[in-house]
């Protein structure tokens, strides 16, 4: 379910957010589905409950989830989830950096493009199987 890399430059908090976003955007966490409680998730992924709470608050701020007091945190309607301009710019920058790395490694533009399309197709196929 979660992939946390303790050696990553990204904080654990950011990695928790990224993992949950991916689960939501790929449909593995369905609209209206209740997320594990802060305590449950922190125990499952062995992180501090404050880290999970902070991630849940940020996901709520971004519109990925909503919280009902005393009931829990739930996945928001995917059709209403919109990445903000900052996130889109960051994702585009990461893609650009990876693409330039392919070219730096000596691949042609067409070879790099083929790899990008292959990765996108693999992602789509794995999402279809879930």
Regions found by a protein language model. Name each.
Residues 1-34, 40, 89-93, 99-126:
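Extreme N-terminal segment that seeds HTH/winged-HTH DNA-binding domains in transcriptional regulators
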Residues 28-29, 33, 61-70, 76-78:
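Beta-hairpin "wing" of winged helix-turn-helix
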């Amino acid at each position: 379910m979660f992939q946390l890399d303790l050696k990553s430059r990204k904080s654990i908090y950011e990695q928790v957010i990224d993992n949950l976003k991916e689960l939501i955007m790929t449909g593995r966490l369905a609209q209206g589905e209740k997320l594990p409680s802060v305590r449950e998730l922190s125990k499952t992924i062995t992180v501090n409950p404050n880290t999970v709470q902070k991630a849940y608050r940020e996901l709520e701020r971004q519109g990925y989830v909503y919280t009902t007091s005393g009931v829990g945190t739930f996945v928001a309607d995917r059709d209403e989830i919109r990445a903000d301009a900052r996130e889109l710019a960051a994702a585009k920058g990461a893609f650009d950096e990876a693409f330039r790395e392919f070219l730096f490694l000596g691949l042609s533009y067409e070879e790099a493009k083929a790899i990008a399309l292959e990765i996108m197709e693999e992602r789509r196929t794995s999402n279809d199987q879930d």
